[in-house]
Swiss-Prot record:
One of its GO terms (biological process) is translation. Residues 1-10 have a biased composition (Low complexity). Residues 16-29 have a biased composition (Basic residues). Gene3D superfamilies: Ribosomal protein S11. This is Small ribosomal subunit protein uS11. It comes from Koribacter versatilis (strain Ellin345). One of its GO terms (molecular function) is structural constituent of ribosome. Disulfide bonds: none annotated. Located on the platform of the 30S subunit, it bridges several disparate RNA helices of the 16S rRNA. Forms part of the Shine-Dalgarno cleft in the 70S ribosome. Keywords: Ribonucleoprotein, Ribosomal protein, RNA-binding, rRNA-binding. Part of the 30S ribosomal subunit. Interacts with proteins S7 and S18. Binds to IF-3. Residues 1-29 are annotated as: Disordered. Signal peptide: none annotated. The keyword 4Fe-4S does not apply.
Length: 142
């Protein structure tokens, strides 16, 4: 008796269930922050709303640039343009830009954000500078 009831319950579980996926909701963010992290090897552009929630991001590596090409100004420009277009789809019109790092893609990424139709209001350099903190790595001898 108990076995028959158990097999009937198991038969009900095997039936197909329809999974309904909710479409990702587009946020309407008129103003945001662009964080540009430019290292010697790569450039990462992240666009967020004022509270820090990420709206869009792109990096030179995610666009298919590999090796030493990731650190070029052109790769940074492409990453910034793509991230800006994604942010404009969310209704973003103006940006405050925060640039960090010593990379060669700093300037071109900021120019690309402005060229993509976003109003750049403030450009702030937030590169971390140590007050004689950690000992730097030894010099390269090539």
């Amino acid at each position: 008796m108990a076995k028959a009831a158990g097999s009937a319950a198991a038969g009900e579980k095997k039936g197909k269930t329809n999974k309904k996926f909710k479409k990702k909701e587009r946020k309407h963010v008129p103003h945001g922050l662009a964080h540009i992290q430019a290292s010697f090897n790569n450039t990462i552009v992240t666009i967020s709303d004022p509270s820090g929630n990420v709206v869009s991001w792109k990096s030179s590596g995610s666009l298919g640039f590999r090796g030493s090409r990731k650190g070029t100004p052109f790769a940074a420009q492409q990453a910034a343009m793509t991230a800006a277009n994604m942010a404009r789809d969310h209704g973003m019109r103006s940006l405050d830009v925060r640039v960090a790092g010593p990379g060669s893609g700093r300037e071109s990424a900021v120019r690309a954000l402005a060229a993509a139709g976003l109003d750049v209001r403030v450009i702030r350099d937030v590169t971390p500078i140590p007050h004689n903190g950690c000992r730097p790595p030894k010099r390269r001898r090539v």
